């Protein structure tokens, strides 16, 4: 089992924002650990894996930043240019609930790179299976509009990279999260080579996506499956 991670992705923070509000006046800055999408839970997982000895049973690896060529298969140049410019000039709020600090572009590209490396390692037979522990996350990010703390569409970038190398044909994405994977859904909504399946809490986030009736369109009709669950649903 390959375990792909990089401490630097845990340094991603909200910059000069408190949650999604600009700091100033009565708005006090908050640490990265105070964000709803916090690095501390991920760092805690790594620590537990180390002290229990589990880390020694894994093939631990890191990765490079996803190259621009890979990012452009999902995100338009205009989006990447805007993101990079803001990142180089101290960060800011790029979309809906996506504050980031200086260097956020490079950390998002590194997060995407970890996903790319994990997928490629499995498809080439280098490892049997893999897990990429990285942030910022990606399943809410649309090609030209980030939201929900997601700045780049990590899994879509990884899928397109694998396809470009001839490593993957038909792909299934299983998104298990309290939130609907609206970004991943939108990217592949009209395609029949990628099946997207999302388990999520009904009516959570985003409020207007994730309906059972949303099944794809055109060639992608039937290749998008939403399984919204009621709040409080258990394991049975």
Question: Can you describe what each PLM-predicted range is?
Answer:
Residues 1-236:
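HDAC/HDAC-like amidohydrolase catalytic core signature
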């Amino acid at each position: 089992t390959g375990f792909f991670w990089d401490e630097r992705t845990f340094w991603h923070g909200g910059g000069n924002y408190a949650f999604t509000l600009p700091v100033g006046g009565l708005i006090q800055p908050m640490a990265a650990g105070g964000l709803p999408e916090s690095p501390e839970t991920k760092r805690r997982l790594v620590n537990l894996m180390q002290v229990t000895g589990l880390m020694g049973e894994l093939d631990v690896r890191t990765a490079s930043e996803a190259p621009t060529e890979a990012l452009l298969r999902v995100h338009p140049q205009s989006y990447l240019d805007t993101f990079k410019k803001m990142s180089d000039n101290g960060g800011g709020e790029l979309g809906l609930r996506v504050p980031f600090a200086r260097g956020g572009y490079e950390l998002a590209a590194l997060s995407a790179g970890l996903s790319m490396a994990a997928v490629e390692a499995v498809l080439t037979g280098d490892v049997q299976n893999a897990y990429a522990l990285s942030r910022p996350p990606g399943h809410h990010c649309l090609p030209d509009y980030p939201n929900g703390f997601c700045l780049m569409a990590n899994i879509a970038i990884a899928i397109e990279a694998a396809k470009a190398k001839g490593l993957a044909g038909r792909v299934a994405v299983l998104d298990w999260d309290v939130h609907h994977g609206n970004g991943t859904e939108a990217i592949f909504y009209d395609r029949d080579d990628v099946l997207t399946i999302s388990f999520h809490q009904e009516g959570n986030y985003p409020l207007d996506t994730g309906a059972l009736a949303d099944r794809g369109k055109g060639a992608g009709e039937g290749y998008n499956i939403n399984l919204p669950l009621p709040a409080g649903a258990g394991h049975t």
